[in-house]
Amino acid sequence: MAIDPLHTGERTSLFRRMRVDTRPLRRRDYRNLWIGQAISTVGGEIGTVAVPYQVYTLTHSTALVGLLGLASLIPLLVVPLVGGAIADALDRRAVLLRTETGMAVVAALFLANALLAHPRVWALFVLQGIAVSIFSLGRPAMSSLTPRLVPNEEIAAAAALTSVYNSLAAVGGPAVGGILIAAAGVPWTYGIDLVTYTASFFVIWLLPKMPPLGEVDRPSLRAILDGFRFLKGRQPLIGIFAVDTAAMVFGMPTALFPAIALHQLQGDAATVGYLYAAPYSGAFLGSLVSGWTSHVRRMGVGVTIAACVWGAAIAAFGFTTSLWPAMFFLAIAGGADFFSAVLRSTMLMRVTPDHLLGRLQGIEFMQVASAPSLGDLEAGVLASLTSLRFSVVSGGVLCIVGCIATALALPKFLRYDAREPAA
């Protein structure tokens, strides 16, 4: 059979545009940052299983396990804003080195507590709050390093590469943690966590110094408020926050996964795990074909479409009655959320000047971390008043309505062109 070289070339070109864009990894400093954060993220995800498992086995109280979420939520609402102000005022590499050191120390304390004959439950709560606080303090500095390490045309590719290890760690980390606990015991998970944070420290140490550029504001309440003031009138930034909030508040039914798995899908505990893993699996698969995101010009349109696909997939998930269709639609939702996150992150980094980027990253992290909790609350309350199916389906529909309303109310967000990054 004759092969058409023209069509073969077109297919090759399409494949290159679709596959994950690895150009940023050719740059040594970005590669070191990526490796360091990938190591610590995987270790952190492995460790996430250990704390709730230990609390439950020591107390046999699901209420106390639930309170761990409160110990995490309070720092997530405050500390990222402080971390953003610090990232804009100090050397960002130095901030990361200190936070990685702090995370390693906390992992060592978790390990020491686990090795006691009678581990202290109160210590688990205190250390969990400290760990989340330190992580939230360093996250804005880490997120705001990318524009200093790659050119504008590679920012979308860098954002996609970050999501590669995030999604892979979210799927594999807890599974590895569970296997480790079953095979070797809880202390091993904390030990691996300690090793990964230590390794991450030495990789980040290889980065060049990252002092502030331009004007420097000392970390203060005024500096934090300046970040919020910068948002005023900048529709591209307001739009990315509003669309993601609509998607997470209305279309985030993860709190209902146990009930859906057991009652609507007639499954068991394993089914619950599959539902939690499905969106991250979709995100990982999406990351493998994310090369096209570097060529998107109308990013506001892209964010809106991706968020609407998320809402539609969640609504479809609400109608499912068996596992495989449920996982399929959740994977579609996860892939859509991945593409939305890449485009939102790219817009944020391109629109925001470097001297404010840490603070805007702090605001973004606070929003991303807290909105799903509101979504769980909305889904749970509505399901208790109506039904599981109505809560999920109506949430997906409201997500679509909210995203379209945002796009119509913020025309500059919808018209944002990547060739003109200034807000």
Regions found by a protein language model. Name each.
Residues 2-423:
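Alpha-helical transmembrane-bundle signature of multi-pass membrane transport and export proteins
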